[in-house]
Amino acid sequence: MSSDVTLAQPGRDAFLASSLEVAPRLLGAVLRHESAEGPVALRITEVEAYTGEGLDPGSHAFRGPTRRNAAMYGEPGRLYAYFTYGMHVCANVVCSPAGEASAVLLRGAEIVEGLALAERRRAGASGRRIPQRDLARGPARLVVAAGIGLADDGADLLAPPFGLLLPSVQPEYATGPRTGVSGAGGGAAFPWRYWLPGEPSVSPYKRHPASHG
């Protein structure tokens, strides 16, 4: 990102739009989480948009509200965190007015504060060294590096212990099909993955074997 791009804290109304509008605006944004261990901040480089009921076959809200996706229907600017594949947590920014399910999955980021803490979290018990580009490259890795867990589901991203700053200028970005989404939702009709070209922290595209279209 150019050094002349400034960051500012948005109002909640910045997230009232659909995830399709909010997703590219989050590229270059900085998400900060301060836990008991200390702060970690990430510059977002890759996201995916998911919309609501009956509109997006790749969305958790496609068939309506459940206990699991309740936060997705909540106040915009909050966190929707969920457990996936029996082992990983993923983090999303809730968009659209409350009652309309819409969210942006955080897929990749660069650590810009708290690098040592992010490295310890990602190394875990193994203590192995993780390349810096891989610390938050992919949604599950991003969550671990940031210290986000299921207990944060529904948390306000615009208030402590979180903080979210948006760039003053929209950076150039690329789009394409979403990663690992099965069925039509993973096809070319839903090019709702957005990323900053040339950023090392952007995860490689992986087509789901059951995606089509």
Curated annotation (Swiss-Prot):
Gene Ontology molecular function, alphabetical: alkylbase DNA N-glycosylase activity; DNA binding
Task: Indicate yes or no for the key word DNA damage.
Answer: yes
InterPro entries membership: Formyl_transferase-like_C_sf (IPR011034), MPG (IPR003180), MPG_sf (IPR036995)
* NCBIfam families the UniProt entry points to: 3mg, PRK00802.1-3
Q: Which HAMAP family match?
A: 3MGH (MF_00527)
Family recorded in the similarity comment: Belongs to the DNA glycosylase MPG family.
What is the designated name of this protein?
Putative 3-methyladenine DNA glycosylase
Q: Which organism is it from?
A: Leifsonia xyli subsp. xyli (strain CTCB07)
